[in-house]
């Protein structure tokens, strides 16, 4: 039976974990068809991602270790949007912290949910143009080991197809920006 536009009714919400970056909760809902069920949800404040482009048309990516997948993965610079922070400010900070570049211009590409089946995390995607290398790159945090990787848009596309770039937020943002990047 289709639900139509009627939203489910929240019967009970139970918070199981509140961490620094996310919360985990279980919600008891009554659906419009009167069926009741429990739905798990990861609450996240949102993230911002940037595709930095050098004046030569190269894209700046980072390769870093991600404990959750026990691997060093290739991705575009991104970070959690802090409370009250504009997502554009998040990417300006992340470009500098993760790559040692500064963008003269930040252009919004769009926004999308990362995994709406279990999380409310939204990703704000941007293009960073007019990059300049910082004279003094910031020091990496003790828990970060980041390698900066420069690639052409065509090389990024090949990295996606080969599985070297397997980060969903980076792939989604690249798809949004692809036509702009390939025409430069």
What are these regions (language model features)?
Residues 179-184:
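Generic C-terminal helix-cap and adjacent flexible tail
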Residues 12-49, 54-55:
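Acidic, metal-coordinating catalytic segment for phosphate/diphosphate chemistry
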């Amino acid at each position: 039976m289709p639900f139509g536009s009627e939203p489910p009714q929240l019967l009970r919400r139970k918070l199981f974990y509140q961490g620094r970056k996310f919360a985990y909760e279980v919600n008891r809902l009554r659906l419009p068809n009167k069926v009741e069920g429990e739905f798990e949800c990861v609450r996240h404040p949102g993230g911002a991602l940037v595709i930095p482009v050098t004046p030569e048309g190269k894209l700046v990516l980072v390769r870093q270790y991600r404990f959750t997948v026990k691997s060093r993965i290739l991705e575009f610079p991104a970070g959690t949007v802090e409370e009250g922070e504009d997502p554009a400010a998040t990417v300006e900070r992340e470009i500098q912290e993760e790559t040692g570049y500064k963008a003269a211009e930040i252009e919004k590409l769009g926004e999308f949910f990362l995994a709406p089946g279990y999380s409310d995390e939204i990703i704000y995607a941007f293009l960073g143009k007019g990059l300049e290398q910082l004279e003094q790159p910031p020091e990496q945090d003790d828990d970060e080991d980041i390698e900066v990787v420069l690639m052409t848009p065509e090389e990024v596309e090949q990295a996606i197809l080969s599985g070297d770039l397997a980060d969903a937020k980076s792939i989604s943002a690249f798809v949004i920006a692809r036509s702009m990047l390939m025409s430069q």
